[in-house]
Swiss-Prot record:
Keywords: RNA-binding, Transcription, Transcription antitermination, Transcription regulation. The lineage of its organism: Bacteria, Bacillati, Bacillota, Bacilli, Lactobacillales. GO terms for molecular function: RNA binding. This is Transcription antitermination protein NusB. Involved in transcription antitermination. Required for transcription of ribosomal RNA (rRNA) genes. Binds specifically to the boxA antiterminator sequence of the ribosomal RNA (rrn) operons. InterPro entries: NusB-like_sf, NusB_fam, NusB_RsmB_TIM44. It comes from the Bacteria.
Length: 142
């Protein structure tokens, strides 16, 4: 992959992850999304943020408590969501949001996409953990 993003769905998912991660450190919704979308653009002007990116970020933000509750229910005994790394927590929220609430994307596609992003931003162990947890929500009928 080159240093610049295209505008593929995977790239926009990755930017959504970056925006959500930034927001965990105090960034607000629009500025975090704009930064994630513009940070590697050649020109200095801001670009319109694609609706798909905004939908993912806004969806995770609006469903964060519900997503966290679902994730907590599926962690091993003795584990808490706070024990997870911020990277893994953010990816679980993003992947789970797309699987549970974003019907435009088939579950398996959402799962595979978040696994590929996890491999880039985390390690193989985390990618397997995310796969194991999120695969419980993937419908076999797809």
């Amino acid at each position: 992959m080159t240093n610049s993003f295209e505008n593929s769905r995977r790239d926009l998912r990755e930017r959504a992850f970056q925006a959500l991660f930034n927001m965990e450190h105090g960034g607000d919704f629009l500025s975090a999304s704009q930064f994630a979308y513009d940070y590697d653009k050649v020109s200095d002007q801001e670009h319109d943020i694609p609706a798909f990116l905004l939908t993912l970020v806004n969806g995770v933000v609006n469903h964060k408590d519900e997503l966290d509750a679902i994730i907590k229910e599926h962690l091993k005994a003795g584990w808490s969501i706070e024990r997870l790394t911020l990277t893994d927590r953010t990816m679980l929220r993003l992947g789970l949001y797309e699987i549970k609430f974003f019907e435009e994307t088939p579950d398996r596609v959402a799962l595979n996409e978040i696994i590929e992003i996890a491999k880039k931003y985390s390690d193989e162990t985390s990618a397997k953990f995310i796969n194991g947890l999120l695969s419980q929500f993937v419908s076999d009928s797809e």
